[in-house]
Amino acid sequence: MFIVGLTGGIGSGKSAASQWFEKQGIQVVDADIVAREVVDVGQPALKEIATAFGDWVLQADGSLNRRALREHIFQSPESRHTLEAITHPIIRKSIIEQLNAATSPYVILVSPLLFETNQHELTDRNLLIDASEEIQIARASQRDGQSIQQIQKIIAAQMPRAEKQQRADDIVLNDGHLKHLYQQLIALHENYLNH
């Protein structure tokens, strides 16, 4: 199976790109969705997180208080490493299972931390959806309702844009309209079909 890693910073347009690929009949494995699934109520990772951090990470219904944990880990690199040590191996295992089950001509692995978590090792080619930091902030603040400061912290915690550009095999600049994004994806889709 030919696997294309799709990455980009917050607000870059990863979701728009992955949805476009899905409309072309290409299966998509989304690392963010997998990351949410592995910490659902009843999953072993959730219990490990509560043990490591305390019950304050749980909401009244027993689910993960994502916002509180996110704010905590962006203030504490040590806590972020603890969380990653718990979740990343479980996430990777689930991603591999889903990639192996794919039946489309190729499969997309969407991951905002494709390079940071070494998920690029699972791929044959890597596509960066790129946007300027100003556009990332504008899109993410509109979409998520987060403050500019929170978004800047997320951007700062991710691999620098220039490094992602160096590591990517393909780069799509998404500073404009969706139509422009889709036009760029058409050519890449054809290339991926003919891998």
Curated annotation (Swiss-Prot):
Question: Could you give a GO molecular-function term held by this entry?
Answer: dephospho-CoA kinase activity
**Classification via Gene3D superfamilies:** P-loop containing nucleotide triphosphate hydrolases
- From what superkingdom does this record's organism come? Bacteria
Q: Which Pfam families match?
A: CoaE
UniProt family annotation: Belongs to the CoaE family.
Q: Where does ATP bind?
A: G11, S12, G13, K14, S15, A16
Query: What is its subcellular localisation?
Result: Cytoplasm
Alphabetical keyword list: ATP-binding, Coenzyme A biosynthesis, Cytoplasm, Kinase, Nucleotide-binding, Transferase
Stated name of the protein: Dephospho-CoA kinase
Q: What is its EC number?
A: 2.7.1.24
The root-end lineage is: Bacteria, Pseudomonadati, Pseudomonadota, Gammaproteobacteria, Moraxellales
Organism, scientific name:
Acinetobacter baylyi (strain ATCC 33305 / BD413 / ADP1)
